[in-house]
């Protein structure tokens, strides 16, 4: 179930394709997305969206756009 997939995201009028993978995490899941050289982990939050965890700084608007795309895919 950890098969990689491509996540297409339209950000600032440009279509981006990010490598991503689904990860089982106990009773829930995480989705790891490679943005540039940084792996950003998205996990479900209490409101039905996704929160981002990253070790390096990443554009906040881009993270919000990716999180919204993931929320749409999970519905």
Regions found by a protein language model. Give the residues of each.
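Cysteine-centric segments in proteins
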Residues: 1-75
């Amino acid at each position: 179930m950890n098969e990689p997939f491509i996540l297409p995201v339209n950000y600032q009028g440009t279509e981006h394709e990010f490598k991503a993978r689904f990860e089982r995490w106990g009773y829930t899941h995480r989705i790891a997305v490679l943005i540039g050289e940084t792996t950003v982990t998205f996990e479900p939050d209490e409101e039905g969206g996704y929160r981002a965890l990253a070790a390096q700084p990443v554009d906040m608007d881009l993270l919000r756009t990716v999180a919204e795309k993931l929320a749409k895919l999970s519905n």
